[in-house]
Amino acid sequence: MGNFQKEYGESELIDTYLNIAVAETLKELRKEYNYSYSELANKLTKKVSRQTLNNYELGKSKLRMDMFMEFAKVYHLTPKELYEKINMKYISKLSQYTEEITKKEK
């Protein structure tokens, strides 16, 4: 993750880690439920392409609130539960980044 610091400013770096946390959480949930992109797309009430789902999981597309609610519903989670999963991943990513910086400063 050290390369992000070269490419982004500090405020954008925080946003980048949040985007990574969202992407990884969505990918983990899809795999946990053994859904292909096509199966997941069929379960969502809002029509999205497999490519859009892939972009969410790669962090190339930011998740809008309506899609956040859709994913929570498909994975049988309350919005709060999905938020907490993402938040835990985000905290983990920031902790890793902080450890990297601390090691470099020593």
Over which residues does each language-model region extend?
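Conserved hydrophobic/aromatic packing and binding residues within compact polymer-binding modules
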Residues: L26, L40-A41, L53-Y56, L82
